[in-house]
Amino acid sequence: MENPFEITAVVAREILDSRGNPTVEVEVYTPISMGRAAVPSGASTGTHEALELRDGGKRYHGKGVRRAVENVNKIIAPELIGMDVTWQRDIDTLMLELDGTENKSNLGANAILGVSLAVAKAAANALGLPLYQYIGGTNAYVMPVPMSNVINGGVHAGNELDFQEFMIMPVGADSFREAIRWVSETYHVLKKVIAEKYGKDAINVGDEGGFAPPMKEVTEPLETLIKAIEEAGYKPGDEIALAIDAASSEFYHPDIGKYVVAGKEYTREELVDLYKELVSAYPIVSIEDPFQEEDWEGFKLITRELGGKIQIVGDDLFVTNPKRIRKGIEMGAANALLLKVNQIGTLSEAIDAAYTAFRAGYGVVVSHRSGETEDATIADLAVALNAGQIKTGAPARSDRNAKYNQLIRIEEELEGIAHYPGRKFRNPFF
């Protein structure tokens, strides 16, 4: 008798992401289901991330992924045919063994992740379960508070802002649907505020749907956001709070051993003082990557100084890697993890990273990358983990709204039991 959960085919192809660059899409088939997943790609990448395999050469300016696609079709697929699609961890472990490297540089993290996520989706579909419930079980019910990146700087923009992202968080909303309405309304007012001050050229949107007006001083976007929140009819801090992704690796100058913000040099201690000034002047509740990816002492210092008051998120510091997360926990560096599935390369390892963080009392922010697709897996993952937070761009561009729309559907499915944590986003159960 045919096993309905047996993998019958694994097919990979090259598709385009939101930046028009190639990425990997994978389909996994069983006799009764199919799962499809597409892999995202980052612009500001941590040195310790799992390796994304690109072809090089002239085709797609070297960014083709035919090698990764071939690795799925020729190497991974034959090994998976006949396996039970619900054996997620076994399948992920097998792919790690097939690759045989620490950073997945042999087969490519983009090949392995595409298969890993497609396997989970095919299994969920075979069982007739929504993906968040398949991954998280019956206890998956916490909706995430959106961290919406509405003003861009750094490598995401062509302006002079050194900090990469300025975000709004609707902490005073009662539900996800209400939260996303507040974000959308504020975003549209922000567009008007920026156009009035900086002109129409300043309201073109970046990779993640945010605006990149010609600002330089870090206080400019914060002042602009406060104005937009108030004009949209909301209270800054009480209803909509602010968050920053400094992405400090991008403005650290190793030749002088200092950080350069708006043309001014800062030592580690001086940069902590700048963050403290910003937190006391504005309703900032979260700062991501306040120091460069190897500045463990800087993270330790800011966590000691501000960690009792706000969330300190490690992205490039941790790169979703359980070993680096454990080091941070031991040192008291940061108090939250930015979870990007493509930094580590399999669903099982991403879940392990999240639970390593949770067990230490750290928060977890499930995150997109700047190069995305219509794939909305991270929306389901945020609910599956009860993470309480998601970072997936401005409420603009279909690649970002695909995630928000999926969360609206999930909240509707969980009618009566869905919990929106609001201000308790870092520890939604306490």
Curated annotation (Swiss-Prot):
Spans through the membrane: none
Residues where (2R)-2-phosphoglycerate binds: Q164, K340, R369, S370, K391
Cofactor: Mg(2+)
Enzyme class: lyase
UniProt-listed Pfam families: Enolase_C, Enolase_N
Entry GO terms, CC: cell surface; extracellular region; phosphopyruvate hydratase complex
Subcellular location field: Cytoplasm; Secreted; Cell surface
This protein's record includes keyword Cytoplasm: yes
Chain positions recorded as Mg(2+) binding sites: D245, E288, D315
GO annotation terms (biological process): glycolytic process
Keyword annotations: Cytoplasm, Glycolysis, Lyase, Magnesium, Metal-binding, Secreted
One example GO MF annotation: magnesium ion binding
Cofactor binding, per record: Binds a second Mg(2+) ion via substrate during catalysis.
Residues at the active site: E208, K340
Domain of life: Archaea
UniProt xrefs under Gene3D superfamilies: Enolase-like C-terminal domain (3.20.20.120), Enolase-like, N-terminal domain (3.30.390.10)
EC number(s) given by UniProt: 4.2.1.11
Family: Belongs to the enolase family.
UniProt function note: Catalyzes the reversible conversion of 2-phosphoglycerate (2-PG) into phosphoenolpyruvate (PEP). It is essential for the degradation of carbohydrates via glycolysis.
HAMAP family: Enolase
NCBIfam families: eno
Protein name in the entry: Enolase
Species this protein is from: Thermococcus onnurineus (strain NA1)
Underlying gene: eno
